[in-house]
């Protein structure tokens, strides 16, 4: 037999094998019984996932419309821009479709997409039937499993310890740290004068709030075990080459990029290869993050062994984590050193990006909607007296529980501009699940399940809730349904209700997930964002900075455009505009 015949035979066998696998996949997808959408590519291809979301609008301008309509729903973050069901033709029809679930079929696999609140609730409740995907380990589990990436009994062990740690002591520490770093970092923006006429125009508000958020997470994460805040002003002590803040920030900012590669590979990246300097820097940051925290954990373990009390002035995550891990009698239920480091990274990376993103949206929303800012200012003035120089202490147990409107503002920001646009799970085995129409759907094992968070947060069930809590000056928009409007008052129940804040129906509000795997840092995030808004509005007002001749309506339209200019890089965030300027004016 000639070489050509051998080659052709092997090629035909390969094609037949691929065709058989594809046909079997189609049969499995059809057996689910939901509408199917075919795309002419592998939607899970690593390079496509990595590059397509960054080049979404470029692809849209280059591709023919018929091809773009097919490929657009394979781009990560498509749910921010497209209808919740691609079978619908109207781009505004995010939630009015009859079928809120469909199957996306590519060349290698298929995905089950849903915006059905009943399905979302069931998937998030059944944590052993629908597990965290392995892909998450490449992003957040470089040092070992943690509470965000583990499954099964391993997850239960992590969850038990982490929930002991992220408690009211941490929430109080976050509240106090938020006030401290707000005063320290925003002193040149939140200026005051005796005649109350101080006003500052700045393009640095986003950057400063990001710096505050990062400082809070480090401070609450490792406490004051060493002077990390001013460390970059000094030469790092050997064997370190980077300040702790710089190492952690470099690692976190690249967690969804080059940091998915092993640190050993990055640290030995060839000098002749492209990106040599960046690769080595990221690799070094990962190595030093691990080294630093191993040292801190060793210090804490030695302190506990000697029976000494903590020297930190506030509760910190790493000390509480070591204490909680060592408190159990069964050593198999404790966390290893690498698992503690992994949980610390998940705590910092997960919190930093999501909280900083929420603060960006919150600032734009404050400037865009003066009605709601006035509504918040009424509450701020009732909680925090105007007298004093602003340095007097504020009590967490007194202030935070009464910040009802401010927390409602935070919740509405998370509803419309939350960092998670989708939640991803894998069916651990064949599963059955009932959709809202009453039909039972059977999902084969290893089905990739995606919950469309954006669509859930725009459901008609959000419409016209708690209008009695609206400010007197509020007027509904004739141009958009209520669920698409930013209306924080929907979160405040009337007096005499069982709960102060509205509790959405199950499966309709999932910015921090839901069920047993709800984000353990949810309360911490709410406390931080709420406290920083209170600090911003304590004596000041935030307004859009207007160009000469620009009206307030023009400025507000510009902010509307900014709110639509979002990007997806693992999480949802505002596209940063270095020229976006705000006026911060003293009001009392």
Curated annotation (Swiss-Prot):
It is an enzyme of class 1 (oxidoreductase). The lineage of its organism: Eukaryota, Fungi, Dikarya, Ascomycota, Pezizomycotina. It holds the Pfam family p450. Heme binds at residue 519. It comes from the Eukaryota. Belongs to the cytochrome P450 family. Residues 467-486 have a biased composition (Basic and acidic residues). Residues 467-490 are annotated as: Disordered. Its EC number is 1.-.-.-. This is Phomenoic acid biosynthesis cluster cytochrome P450 monooxygenase. Induction: Expression is positively regulated by the phomenoic acid biosynthesis cluster-specific transcription regulator C6TF. The keyword Coiled coil does not apply.
